[in-house]
């Protein structure tokens, strides 16, 4: 009967809401993620990737919410996308990369027993730097490639959010290597909460 369907769709909606919540007044998005301990020792350019995407197992944090819904959530809190990078930009050499544009975001991580800390604090890098996360946008590329990429650690033409501090070409030219910091993050598989705020 029709009833059971309604119940099921309600259950699914609740599940979706629990993995990502949006507060338009506070201009913030909260996403549940899991630590992937592989990247304590292996470098990756992926900060957060939705577990259902093709790159779902390639990130420091496995995102539990869909990157395309995350894109919409950013629009909903009033963020403007940069949409300035193309696939061609991703083939940059060590000295001609482009930086992602778009509204600046302040991103924090917290978990049981740990208050909010900046996302930068969970990343170990071979170079010292200041993170500059931007709403790159890239929804067309996200739909086409289905990588699941939520947050990239260098400027990216597919990830919804990426870091303007590092131009395209950073990782493939070995300018910087990024890891999850095992001295900061909890153990592999631990659930953490990531908070994205539109910077003032």
Which positions does each model-derived feature cover?
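Bacterial Sec-dependent signal peptides at the C-terminal "C-region" and cleavage site
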Residues: 1-15
